[in-house]
Amino acid sequence: MAKKIKQIAIYGKGGIGKSTTTSNISAALSIAGYKVMQFGCDPKSDSTNTLRGGEYIPTVLDTLRDSHSVKAQDVIFEGFNGIYCVEAGGPAPGVGCAGRGIITSVSLLKQQRVFEELDLDFVIYDVLGDVVCGGFAVPVREGIAEHVYTVTSADFMAIYAANNLFKGIQKYSREGGALLGGVIANSINAPYAKEIVDDFVKRTDTQVVEYVPRSVTVTQSELQGKTTIEAAPQSEQAKVYQRLAQRIAEHTESKVPAPLDTHELRQWAADWGKQLVALESGLIAPAAAGNL
């Protein structure tokens, strides 16, 4: 009987730390003995940089444009600790759909049965989450990914993007699409950031998988073109990523989230804005945050 490959999609708005988080998860899983492929699904094509010493790799779409026929070995590159790295790429500037690279790349690798031939344990898709449409929705819509995670902070636009993803998961769940594994709360250092994220996941019937603090260790590692797992394996930040990777590896039950509608989300955000003003001015006690 063929081994079941665990396919995971990690979404998040641009700049939220999605690729940093994904690469450290991949690195931690590989250190734990799993065979991993990281599949970059962002037109910037930089998902796998820190797995390859800061180097960019040729993308699937660029390779197709140059040769019109592509073999898997032309677009799969080995990174840190044997992690297989793929970048879908995007169209030429001003031309076509940015999500098209995902559709083309996934089809190419599936046709050539690459996942089975490499005997992978995990395929992790790193997907731009500002919009959940067209090609960017493929891992969710087609059920390619079994479990979906979203990286968010307490910033409104990050939460807005997460809520939009929840809407997409809810819609496609009726057609066999992927379900939500949980929320990865990133950069949780600011006052009340944890409380804001906790309140959001409670209201959307989801869960936080891990709280990832902002850390200078991550910055130092990325300046070297490395993940924290590679550059600072004994650091406290590395332990956070290792714990997150273990939870993802052990996770089996995903669910359909309950997204807020646009009015509910705006009202929720406005209520939190008022609470933060009251907290800062001492009108309410910190323990009351999120309970008003």
Which stretches of residues belong to each language-model region?
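Walker A/P-loop phosphate-binding motif and the immediately C-terminal alpha-helix
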Residues: 3-43
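Flexible beta-alpha connector loops of hexameric P-loop NTPases
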Residues: 90-100, 156-157
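Short, glycine/acidic-enriched loop or turn micro-motifs at the edges of active sites
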Residues: 43-45, 90, 129, 189
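Conserved catalytic-core segment of NTP-binding enzymes
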Residues: 111, 115-122, 127-214, 219-220
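Residue-level signature of catalytic and energy-coupling elements of molecular machines
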Residues: 14, 86, 105, 126, ...
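N-terminal phosphate/diphosphate-binding loop that engages ATP/GTP or pyrophosphate donors
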Residues: 28-88
